[in-house]
Amino acid sequence: MSEQHGAQGNPFPGEPNTGHVWDNNLRELTNPPPKWWMWGLHASWIFTLAYFLAYPSIPLLSSHTKGFLHWTSMSEYRADLKEIEQVRLPYEKRIAALSATDILKDKELSDYSQRTGKVLFGDNCAACHGANGAGNVGFPVLADDDWLYGGTIDKIQESITGGRSGVMLAFAQQLSPQDIDRLAQYVLEWSAGTQAADTEGKRLFTSAGCVGCHGADGKGNQLMGSANLTDKVWRFSHEKEDIKRIIAHGVNFVTDPETRRTQMPAWGQRLSATDIKKLAIFVHELGGGK
């Protein structure tokens, strides 16, 4: 229990304490904090009050106090964006004045286009074509050298600008299920390099008219966007049942309700000509550009 002693009865005379003593020894001292600590304390609440008044701080029903500086994160963002746009402006002007082919010849502009094109690709293209052009099922890989419509910088720019919507005929009404099965097997073997002995498959491939688009050698035709059947690159699936479905119902064949629907949208009205050039250069430099 505490005992309170008067000034005359303080058992520790000369010591700055409150006079409260516990267990004849424990007492409450009255040492003041150092001046530097008190200055820090007062400086902290003064700074807090100034910050409170200068910046947005108090939420209201439909708004908030603005602060006498009228600062907002959006105004800071716009100022930073304006600053970086001034840095980019000389590059953007040069890109606008040159063709994509000429930009590729200029290392500085090419590097700039690839860096900014990567951002554009992530915002607009990666959802279908995957990060860094790795592809997804139904969407072409852009990092290899297998191109449906050509891998030159001009062809890539053309594909981005106008989009692509290739068509493959449906053969369900022309071929029997057995013929479709045999043809699918032939295409599988062709991709694996083991089709040479399949004379019946070759006959079907020719008589059904497949050679008209894919060529007698099966290597496709970039003017038509027809696939190369002799490599191991599959836009959709290499499973036999999926190949049979494509042969039977085609791709984007409007009169067949079971056709595989696939289309690349045109970006000519969504992106500026400069952005399309940068995107084309980024895709071209992923590794498969011609």
Spans of features found by a protein language model:
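Periplasmic c-type cytochrome electron-transfer domains
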Residues: 2-108, 149-155, 170-187, 268-283
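Glycine-rich, flexible loop/turn motifs
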Residues: 18, 25, 29, 138, ...
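Basic, gly/Ser/Thr/Pro-rich low-complexity segments located predominantly at protein N termini
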Residues: 39, 53, 122, 135-138, ...
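Sequence/structural segment immediately N-terminal to covalent heme-attachment motifs in c-type
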Residues: 109-134, 148-150, 157-162, 194-223, ...
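Extracytoplasmic electron-transfer domains, predominantly the class I c-type cytochrome c fold
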Residues: 137, 143-193, 217, 221-224, ...
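Short, solvent-exposed mixed-charge patches
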Residues: 289-290
